[in-house]
Amino acid sequence: MALKIRLRQQGRKNHVVYRLVLADVESPRDGKYIELLGWYDPHSEQNYQLKSERIFYWLNQGAELTEKAGALVKQGAPGVYAELMAKKNARRAVVRQKRRAYRQRLAARRAEAAAK
């Protein structure tokens, strides 16, 4: 079961309010969700409230952010977003390092084969 943190549309005509929810990928946009993680009201002055501890917990459990939810988390909980990006960059650095080592071994084998 793949999980996503995404925005769920609520409210009335011409005054839409969004809930930041954790939901299964296959559930509809306004359908059933697992946990409410915050809300976003683009029409008011204090326009969002996020549960940053729960967002961080679910991201560590493997949930993914949608593009719009990621922008909201970046604005509302920059510490959580920075931690997420640091983990992502650390994983990328490990992969980069493994690729470099593999390419160096491959180049050494080719040089050895050409020398024979």
Curated annotation (Swiss-Prot):
- GO cellular component annotations of the record: cytoplasm; small ribosomal subunit
Q: Identify the SUPFAM superfamilies for this entry.
A: Ribosomal protein S16
GO MF terms on file?
Answer: structural constituent of ribosome
Q: Which InterPro entries match?
A: Ribosomal_bS16, Ribosomal_bS16_dom_sf
The protein's superkingdom reads Bacteria
Keywords from the UniProt entry: Ribonucleoprotein, Ribosomal protein
Q: Which GO terms describe its biological process?
A: translation
Family annotation (PANTHER family): 30S RIBOSOMAL PROTEIN S16 (PTHR12919), SMALL RIBOSOMAL SUBUNIT PROTEIN BS16M (PTHR12919:SF20)
Family (UniProt)? Belongs to the bacterial ribosomal protein bS16 family.
UniProt cross-references to HAMAP family, sorted A to Z = Ribosomal_bS16
The cross-references to NCBIfam families, in alphabetical order and at most eight, read: PRK14522.1, S16
Q: This chain belongs to which protein, by name?
A: Small ribosomal subunit protein bS16
